[in-house]
Amino acid sequence: MQKYLNYKTLYLSLIILCLISLCGAIVYRFYSLNNIGVAISLILAIVLFIIIQRFYTAGNTPKTKISSFKFQVSSFKNLLLTSNFLLLTSYFLLLTSCFYVLLTHQTEQSIISPWQVLPNYFFIFYGLATAILIMIIAKRPGSNIAIKQYSNIILISLHYFLSFSICWIVYKIGYGFDQFIHQATMDLIDKAGEVHPKPFYYLGQYSLIIILHKITFISIEWLNKLLVPALAAVYLPAAIYHALTKWFEDKKTNLLLIITLLIFPFSFFILTTPQNLAYLLLILIIFLGLTCSNVFELLIIYLLAITALAIQPIAGIPAILFAALLTVFHGDKVKIKK
């Protein structure tokens, strides 16, 4: 039986994370995030997820189908058949070398920039990896174009993760100041169940990390380091590609454009803070809004916006306003399909 990874899978995984964050924030605000509070949060998240799933299933028509972005989980095997094996091998060797260089040049010193401790040949490895990735994408596609294009997104996500991981790997203790404050707060909540006073902001990230910590046994320290870089690497390339394909037909150019976006500053995605996580959701909301075509997708945008509001109002309020404007726009143009 073939398994598929598609946009529905990405939507649903994002929905689950948002529901855990939002339900956990509400439970923590009015109760606590002890074991009972975590259990209540998970039950609420599961119930809401089932309701959303039923809503999607009931209203899923050819026009509202989300699974158009579909490719096999075994697509790397197919990618080997449609791409140059030497290019792929070279890319993974260079990618591994980049991570190795980062791990062997960690420092506990207070430095202004990670480039102070990284050797010059890291830039050579990174540049060669980027060039080979561009060659893989630009290479003439084989017989199964869809599988190759979608497999390339996985490679781009790996490249994004490498790019977003430089700081949290090099700074062995941690990067920035806010991250330490938030981690200390979450450690206290994990031990005591709550910390007073309870604000109306930050709770979305606190609840998400603490609940993930309790159900996966991954330390809060590691979750606090990896959350935003990992989520950004997974969801940003897919969301951007999905939006671009709705506007431009040349899929190869769209993929190359996603890689090119790395030339812009991406400091929001190199460490986990409530503001950075909320900004990530806001960016995802904007790209999802560009392709919103049915009520289900609009509801998902509202869910992401409310979650962003529970994490950091600076990004949450614009997210809510964008969702409202999107509703007015589609309502006026009668573009939203039930």
Regions found by a protein language model. Give the residues of each.
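Extracytoplasmic catalytic/substrate-binding loops of multi-pass membrane glycan-assembly enzymes
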Residues: Y171-T185, V195-I211, F217-I220
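Membrane-interface helix caps and helix-loop-helix hairpins in membrane proteins
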Residues: R29-S32, W168-G174, W222, P265-Q275
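Membrane-embedded helix bundles of polyisoprenyl
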Residues: I16-A25, I156-S163, Q205, I209-K214, ...
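Hydrophobic alpha-helical membrane-interfacial segments at the cytosolic entry of transmembrane helices
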Residues: V334-K338
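Extracytoplasmic loop-helix module adjacent to an early transmembrane segment
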Residues: Q149-E194
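Hydrophobic alpha-helical transmembrane segments of multi-pass membrane proteins
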Residues: L10-L17, I169, I173, H196-P197, ...
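Membrane-embedded, hydrophobic transmembrane alpha-helices
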Residues: M1-F69, S75-I145
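Short juxtamembrane and helix-loop transition motifs at transmembrane-helix boundaries
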Residues: Q2-Y7, I112-S113, T185-G193, T216-S219, ...
